[in-house]
């Protein structure tokens, strides 16, 4: 009987720890095989882009990120929570819509980013340039390294 109780307690403790861990690690949507996507959580070199390393307050970096996105004429934040954000970027000429996904990871002082075209195959590097331009703006604001 004691063995069953100990086993049950151990099982519940491990199960609770796994649930808490999986809930704290949010994931960006994966990139498709086409080259029109970049993600800081991608496992392959053609899609991978460095995440943003926060050098101060995560809240300050998060607020600055939202401020920068809101200042862009063709970017609209469509959904946000305390630690996730989705925005849409519309191209000037053809009105193509790209998705921007962002996750704030306070545990590692990191902002994970993804930018992907909804249609087509190639984006001529637009998504990578967008994420790097955003990085530069956040670096100028001294909220990321």
Annotate each PLM feature:
Residues 1-9:
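Sec-dependent signal peptide recognition
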């Amino acid at each position: 009987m004691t063995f069953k109780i100990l086993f049950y307690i151990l099982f519940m403790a491990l199960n609770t720890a796994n649930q808490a861990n999986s809930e704290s690690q949010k994931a960006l949507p994966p990139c498709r095989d086409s080259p029109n996507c970049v993600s800081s959580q991608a496992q392959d070199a053609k899609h991978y882009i460095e995440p943003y390393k926060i050098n101060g307050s995560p809240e300050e970096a998060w607020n600055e990120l939202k401020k920068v996105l809101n200042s862009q004429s063709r970017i609209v934040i469509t959904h946000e929570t305390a630690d996730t954000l989705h925005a849409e970027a519309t191209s000037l000429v053809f009105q193509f819509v790209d998705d921007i996904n962002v996750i704030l990871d306070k545990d590692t002082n990191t902002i994970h980013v993804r930018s992907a075209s909804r249609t087509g195959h190639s984006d001529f590097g637009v998504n990578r340039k967008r994420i790097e331009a955003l990085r530069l703006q956040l670096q100028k604001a001294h909220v990321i390294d």
